[in-house]
Each structure stands twice: as C-alpha cells, then as structure tokens.
C-alpha cells in the first residue's frame, strides 16, 4: 500500500541523487548512452554491408558456375544461406538499437523528474506518462 509506495519513492530519489549531482549530469549520462547506441548502430550497419557484399559475391559465383554447367556445391549454397541469416540478424539488431534509443530517452526523462522531487507526498511520476 502507501508505505510500500513511499519506500519505493524514497529509494528512487536516493538512487537518482546518488547517481547524479545535477540535471546536467543526467543530460551528460543520456548523451553518453545515446552516443554508445548510435556507435553500435554504425558498427552493425558496417557489418551488414560487409555480409551483404559477401553474399552478393557468393551469389555471383554460384550464377557463374550454373551458367558454365558446373554443379554448385552444397557448402556453397549453405554459405549463401548463412550470409542471408546473418543479414536478417543484423537488421534485427539495428531495429532493436533504434527502439533502445527511444527507451533511453524516456528513462532519463524519468530520472530528471525523480531528481526534481523534494519529497514523496505525491509519489513517483508514472514512467508511462513522462514525456519523451
């Protein structure tokens, strides 16, 4: 009930005030988190380009073999399929990182609101209602 909510509120205020000494500390932490995620996206996109180029090269080689009447080895086809799977996984990682950026913004906005609380009279802000 109310006691549990008050305890949770006090713990949140203590946690945020121990982590951050000012609003600008929160801004800086958010900036760092977003930069880290953006770097992960850039690296994953580079990996995706590399894997896509490998797959396209394998597909061209397979087409050349086929046109010249040579059989295409199963391992070759497996490598193409493996590259396609890697591409799908990398695209999914990129989507997840973009979603994570939205979550980070909401998380730090919540931290800002908790940081501003002087007491727990009105309880914690609702995480879902904190503007992003």
Segments the model singles out, each with a brief description of its role:
Residues 53-132:
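Charged, long alpha-helical assembly modules
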Residues 1-11, 42, 88:
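Long, low-complexity, compositionally biased polyampholytic IDRs enriched for Lys/Glu and Gln/Arg
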Residues 13-16, 26, 42, 51, ...:
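Extended aliphatic helical segments
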Residues 25-54, 58:
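Charge/polar-rich, low-complexity and marginally structured segments
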Residues 22-25, 39, 46, 64, ...:
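Short, flexible coil/linker segments at or flanking structured domains
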């Amino acid at each position: 009930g109310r006691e549990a909510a008050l305890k949770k509120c006090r713990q949140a205020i203590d946690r945020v005030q121990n982590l951050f000494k000012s609003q600008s500390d929160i801004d800086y932490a958010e900036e760092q988190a977003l930069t880290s995620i953006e770097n992960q996206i850039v690296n994953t996109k580079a990996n995706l380009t590399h894997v896509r180029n490998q797959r396209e090269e394998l597909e061209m080689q397979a087409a050349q073999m086929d046109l010249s009447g040579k059989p295409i080895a199963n391992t070759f086809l497996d490598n193409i399929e493996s590259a396609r799977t890697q591409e799908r996984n990398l695209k999914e990682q990129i989507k997840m990182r973009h979603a994570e950026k939205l979550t980070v913004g909401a998380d730090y906005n919540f931290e800002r609101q908790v940081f501003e609380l002087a007491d727990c009279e009105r309880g914690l802000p609702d995480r879902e209602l904190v503007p992003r």
